[in-house]
Design a protein with these regions (language model features):
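Hydrophobic alpha-helical transmembrane segments of membrane proteins
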Residues: 1-62, 80-213
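Active-site phosphate/pyrophosphate-handling residues
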Residues: 65
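Short helix-to-coil transition segments within interhelical loops
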Residues: 68-74
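Alpha-helix N-cap/helix-start motif at helix boundaries, enriched for small hydrophobics
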Residues: 76-78
Length: 213
């Protein structure tokens, strides 16, 4: 049931022009900005902003009402929607990595694979954080009333980074992170991303069950 919903969900919004433009934007970032890793960062931000897009499609196509009468559980809808978002995140990351490698080859530069893996791990953690914040809100109140939540994760990270820089915590954190093994950093990023998505799903399911469609 969940797999079928993921396929249905993806076909309802992934081929749309708005979604394809976002994926194209990821490629443009990697082409125009010479700094390796910027495309990966862009892919994470684009994924975060895109999380609300399927909910917009639900309201425009009255799919949210359809979910209420179909023999599909609310939990299957939540898990399926999270799964389709993960698919988009993987697609955006693949495009970002491919463009990064291609442009490094064209420009004749070398890539720091360790740095790219760290950036990717941080990007995955950010997507997980975004899902944990946005999914409960969007499943509870829908896109129209909850669309501004799309900007919350990026603003939260930017605010925390500014605060850390202002009080000097960021410099100390950078020095402390220098000696941390690469596998640990990558594993931590993957774990945080997975936990964020799981938390978002667990919180969203009971909220969605209470919502009248």
């Amino acid at each position: 049931m969940i797999g079928s919903f993921i396929r249905f969900d993806l076909t309802s919004w992934l081929p749309r022009r708005q979604t394809l433009l976002l994926l194209g934007f990821v490629a443009v970032i990697g082409i125009l900005l010479p700094v390796p890793g910027m495309a990966i960062t862009g892919a994470a931000i684009v994924t975060s902003l895109m999380i609300a897009t399927p909910f917009l499609g639900d309201e425009r196509g009255r799919l949210d009402t359809l979910y209420g009468i179909l023999p599909v559980s609310r939990s299957s809808v939540v898990v399926g929607r999270a799964g389709s978002i993960v698919v988009f995140a993987l697609l955006a990351s693949a495009i970002a990595f491919a463009v990064t490698v291609l442009m490094a080859s064209v420009r004749g530069g070398s890539l720091d694979w360790g740095l790219l893996l760290v950036i990717q791990a941080v990007a995955i953690a950010f997507v997980g954080l975004s899902a944990s914040i946005q999914l409960p809100v969007l499943f509870r109140i829908g896109y129209t009333r909850g669309r501004l939540i799309s900007y919350a994760p990026a603003l939260l990270i930017a605010g925390l980074a500014w605060l850390a820089q202002a009080i000097g915590v960021l410099d100390g954190a950078q020095e402390a992170a220098t000696g941390v093994p690469l596998p640990l950093v990558v594993g931590l990023g993957l774990a945080l991303g997975a936990v964020g998505i799981v938390v978002g799903v667990l919180v969203a399911v009971p909220l969605y069950r209470k919502r009248e469609l």
